[in-house]
Amino acid sequence: MNRDTICVQGGYTPGNGEPRQIPIIQSTTFKYATSEDMGKLFDLEADGYFYSRLQNPTCDLVAKKICELEGGTAAMLTSSGQAANFFALFNLCEAGDHIVASSTIYGGTFNLISVTMKKMGITATFVDPLCSEEELDAAFQPNTKVVFGETIANPALTVLDIEKFAKAAHAHGVPLIVDNTFPTPVNCRPFEWGADIVTHSTTKYMDGHGAVLGGAIVDGGKFDWMAHADKFPGLCTPDESYHGITYAERFGKEGAFITKATAQLMRDFGSMQSPMNAYMLNLGLESL
C-alpha cells in the first residue's frame, strides 16, 4: 500500500459486518478461561492482553498503522512524546552508560538527557548536528550505548544528516534513534537513511488537531543486538523478572526492542496511551 492508503487503511482490516472504525476497547483487564492461559501471557509465551497498563487492542492497532507508515517491524504507543523518548533511551541505557545526542533537540528532551538521566547515572555528550564526521566521532566513549537526534529539530529547524549520524553510530556498534515528529513518515522515513529506532510525539502533526497527547516508538528491525551483546545486556542476557528469557534470542532483531520496552518499562512506569486517545489519534492519522 502507498502511504496515503496506509493513513486510512493501515493497521486494521475489518471483517464482514465488523466496525469500519477501530473499536475503542475501554477495559482495564481481559478475561481468560483458565489460569494456564493467563500464565502464558505473563511468561511472554503467547500473544494477547491482560492489563491495559502494558498493552491494549485499540492502542496496538494504531501503533501498527504508524509502524507500517514508517516501514518498521514493531511499534508501541506511549502517553506522550517525552515518554516515548525516555523509553527508547532507557531501554538501552543503565547507570554508567553514555549517550551522544544532537545539541539542537527539543528543550524538554535536552533536559531529559542532560539533567534527569544524569541523576540515573547516564551521561551525555551533545554535538552540533552540522559537525564534521571527525567531530562526531570524537564524541563517542567506550561506554556509549546510543546516538539520538531529531529529523528536523524542534524549534531550531536544523535538519539532521541521518546518514552521517547512522554511519558514526554503527561504526561504534550502537543504534541511532531519530525523533521524526516534525516531518512524520509522510515526508521522511528515517529507516531509509540508516536510523534504527524512530520516535514520535504524536501530539503534533500525527494528531493534527491539538486534541490528544501521545507518543510512539517504532523499531526498524535491522540492528543486530546479539552481535553487540556486550553493550546491551538488557536485551542479550536473561531477564530475571521474566523467568530468564533473553529478548534478543526469543524475539530476534525484529521484535526484541519493543517487547522489552513493553514488558519491562511499560510494566514498571505505566506510561500507556489511553484507548480513547489512540482512537482520536487514528482519526488524525487518516488525514495526515
Language-model segments: which ranges?
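Conserved N-terminal alpha-helix of the aminotransferase class I/II PLP-enzyme fold
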Residues: 34-86, 108-116
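N-terminal "arm"/small-domain region of PLP-dependent enzymes with the aminotransferase-like
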Residues: 1-56, 64
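N-terminal start-of-domain structural block
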Residues: 1, 56, 60, 190, ...
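N-terminal targeting leaders only when they are immediately followed by extended low-complexity/repeat-rich tracts
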Residues: 16, 50-53, 65-68, 129, ...
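Short, basic and Ser/Thr-rich N-terminal targeting/leader segments
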Residues: 19-20, 71, 120
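Conserved PLP-enzyme active-site core in the AAT-like
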Residues: 7-13, 75-288
